[in-house]
Regions:
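Active-site-proximal glycine-rich helix-loop-beta segment
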Residues: 58, 107, 136-138
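N-terminal beta1-alpha1-beta2 module of alpha/beta enzyme domains
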Residues: 2-105
Length: 185
């Protein structure tokens, strides 16, 4: 047992991040039916502004997941019919676009955005994220993914999804280019 004069360490502060998508249905199928749910407003900039204001000061960040394809594997490959009624991350819009508006009405909230090294252009991604970095005063982060959905490849005019090792080799080169483009931006 320690002595009475020992200092009790300060409890560690929690880091809280909200997690959503620019879609009416995220990871909880059917949640869009809850009476208080507002995700049906995902195409309305005031929805994103109100969400950011609600989170600012109480959460450290808002993480916006993204995907470039549709979960089309249930009941056979290429079948999107089961996805639509459940709004299973569908439809989905570009999560980076409302960030500047959200940053303009918040003081401390950070924004994490998913972007794929498989399908993005290093120059265009560096340009977009550098712009967001400046507009948010450094409150933007990148969730780096290589993508995995066959439907994403098809959406982007490829015949098939790249194999795992090929995607990760491309990601390594992609990151080197993006780092160089972002240096000093």
């Amino acid at each position: 047992m320690g002595s009475v004069t020992e200092k009790v360490p300060e409890p560690k502060k929690w880091i809280l991040n909200a997690f959503t998508m620019s879609s009416p249905g995220h990871v909880a199928s059917g949640l869009w039916r809850h009476p208080d749910n507002q995700t049906h407003r995902y195409k309305d900039i005031t929805y994103w502004i109100e969400l950011a204001q609600l989170l600012d000061g109480n959460f450290h960040g808002l993480f916006l997941a993204d995907m470039l394809g549709v979960y089309n594997v249930y009941k056979g490959p290429g079948n999107i019919e089961p996805v639509i009624p459940g709004a299973a991350q569908f439809p989905i819009s570009d999560p980076s676009l409302p960030i500047a508006a959200m940053a303009s009405v918040t003081k401390t909230l950070s924004f994490g955005i998913t972007a794929s090294t498989t399908y993005e252009s290093p120059f265009l991604l560096a340009r977009r994220y550098s712009t967001l970095d400046h507009l948010t005063n450094g409150r933007v982060a990148w969730n780096i993914v290589t993508s995995y959905l066959e439907s994403a490849a098809l959406n982007l005019r490829l015949k098939t999804q790249m194999q795992h090792d090929e995607r990760y080799a491309k990601a390594e080169e992609f990151m080197e280019v993006v780092y160089k483009l972002l240096e000093g931006s």
